Amino acid sequence: RMWAAARAAGGSVDKYFAEIGLPATPALEKRVALILQEFEVRRDHSKLADDNWQDAFFGDGNVTTEQLLGIEQARLDCRHHFNSMRSKLLTLGISQKISALKWQVPTLEEVSTSYDKWLERPIELFELPENLPEVTKSKTFQGTVGTNYWLRFQSPSTLTNDVVTARVYEPENVKNPPTLIYGHGICVEYDHWRGLIDEVEALVKMGVRVIRPEAPWHGRRTPHDRFGGEQFIATSPRGPFDHFCAAVLEWAVLIDWSRNSSTGPVALGGTSLGSMTAH
């Protein structure tokens, strides 16, 4: 929550204290100012690395596979460094005094306004458009296991109305591999941290192509004043409704892409929130 507040504050000490809901003291203001200054430097570095990644992997320029690997390593290093500002913020010693979430619980009327129209025909929530969104494939590079690349497409759900990014791990020398669309847990941002347990490496070595979509409000889809996954909980009960209704449509796009790019079977799975989405 303190990290999300720093994102929203944009370097402003006053905005930071307003975000966390605590009164400022002169001593604490000085410490917060120094941390926010470093926070913005790391944010800028991460944005620059991410912009370079976007241009290299999804742009039209000629980039060697070695350069792509270096650009991806730089992106991940900078994002991990930016995410790690959480530990710096903890040194303020105020984490126990603030709410773990920025609550925005909707009223019954607000939820009803959005969902009452679907009560008679709930299937409409899960109906895909006649024309599925175009899926863009990035350039590829050799990862720790298999060939790695990303897919991007506009979410077909009006509940999120943003761009979905999914990382693909494709096994080597396997014609028409089976595909597993694998969802991550809540608050898990597998594509933005170093040192996480790789849940799919063994599957790729066994010849399975794994697609890992970023869930709504996680990773590249995180709102500017939130941390990854916060909105799912903080806006309950609407958050879970919106998430699952959107994710089902997004996974359907990935199922279609999988079937068009391989004759192998397609399976759904995941951990925690990802497992619930698969069900």
Annotate each PLM feature.
Residues 269-278:
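Gly/Ala-rich beta-loop-alpha elbow adjacent to hydrolase catalytic centers
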Residues 149-157:
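Short beta-strand segments that buttress and anchor functional surface loops
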Residues 1-150:
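N-terminal targeting or regulatory segments adjacent to alpha/beta-hydrolase or S9 domains
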